[in-house]
Amino acid sequence: MIDFFEGVSWLIMPFSGVCVREADSSPMDVFGLWYSEMLRATGAHMREPSAMVLATCDVQNRPSARVVLLKKYGEAGFEFVTNFNSRKGREIADNPQVALVFDWRHIGRQVRVEGLATLMDASESDAYHASRSRESKISAWCSQQSAVLESRKLLLEQFERERQRFDGQEIPRPGHWGGVRVVPHVVEFWEDGAHRLHSRKQYSRGDSGSWSCVDLYP
């Protein structure tokens, strides 16, 4: 048996002591700071630095998780795009309570989010669609995301048919594809610390919409 934990103490980064400033009244301000610092530390070495884990749950309380790409963040929430007929799309329709995780282990940080997923309005989804490459627009039409695929050949044939159908035309957004916004009600910031004495600060949104922040034991 391989011991993956043997001799990995060099991976543990020392606690910087700057996890979250008391003056930060909104977790989105902290997230923006951390996201910028992550990008600076990452440079060109990480593929898809905007990747985040999205966890959903079906009506029988069976969870599922997958990696999606963060498209935008702000006070309104965290945004991504998807096929509404996919497993995650169906589960969000049945149970909009979701969770996100940003795993930035290369800088010793993690952000965990709990929130309510809502579909973005048509104009916002249209804007995301317009920003995509032509090939990505075609793939949104031909992919029956999460459905059983008989063969890779069939998918490529469907892509080619859609490509020919829209040849020389603007490609409209399919109704089954669009944006989702996760409106957070809990955001937790975790930072690695020496001797496993990590820093955890959790923001919670009250009924009035204001945020409160507490420290959690690591």
UniProtKB/Swiss-Prot annotation:
| Purpose | Catalyzes the oxidation of either pyridoxine 5'-phosphate (PNP) or pyridoxamine 5'-phosphate (PMP) into pyridoxal 5'-phosphate (PLP).
Q: Which UniProt keywords apply?
A: Flavoprotein, FMN, Oxidoreductase, Pyridoxine biosynthesis
InterPro entries for this protein: Pyridox_Oxase, Pyridox_Oxase_CS, Pyridox_Oxase_N, Pyridoxamine_oxidase_dimer_C, Split_barrel_FMN-bd
For this protein, the record's PANTHER family field holds:
PYRIDOXINE-5'-PHOSPHATE OXIDASE (PTHR10851:SF0), PYRIDOXINE-5-PHOSPHATE OXIDASE (PTHR10851)
Checking PROSITE patterns in the record gives:
PYRIDOX_OXIDASE
Q: Which GO terms describe its biological process?
A: pyridoxine biosynthetic process
Family from the record: Belongs to the pyridoxamine 5'-phosphate oxidase family.
Can you state the subunit structure given in the record? Answer: Homodimer.
Q: Which residues bind FMN?
A: 66-71, 87-88, 110, 145-146, 190, 200
Q: Which reaction does it catalyse?
A: pyridoxamine 5'-phosphate + O2 + H2O = pyridoxal 5'-phosphate + H2O2 + NH4(+); pyridoxine 5'-phosphate + O2 = pyridoxal 5'-phosphate + H2O2
Q: Copy out the cofactor comment.
A: Binds 1 FMN per subunit.
The protein's name = Pyridoxine/pyridoxamine 5'-phosphate oxidase
Q: A Pfam family matched by this chain, by name?
A: PNPOx_N
| EC numbers, comma separated | 1.4.3.5
Q: Which gene encodes it?
A: pdxH
UniProt pathway: Cofactor metabolism; pyridoxal 5'-phosphate salvage; pyridoxal 5'-phosphate from pyridoxamine 5'-phosphate: step 1/1; Cofactor metabolism; pyridoxal 5'-phosphate salvage; pyridoxal 5'-phosphate from pyridoxine 5'-phosphate: step 1/1
Q: Which organism is it from?
A: Anaplasma marginale (strain St. Maries)
The record's top EC class is: oxidoreductase
Check the record and name the NCBIfam families matching this protein: pdxH, PRK05679.1
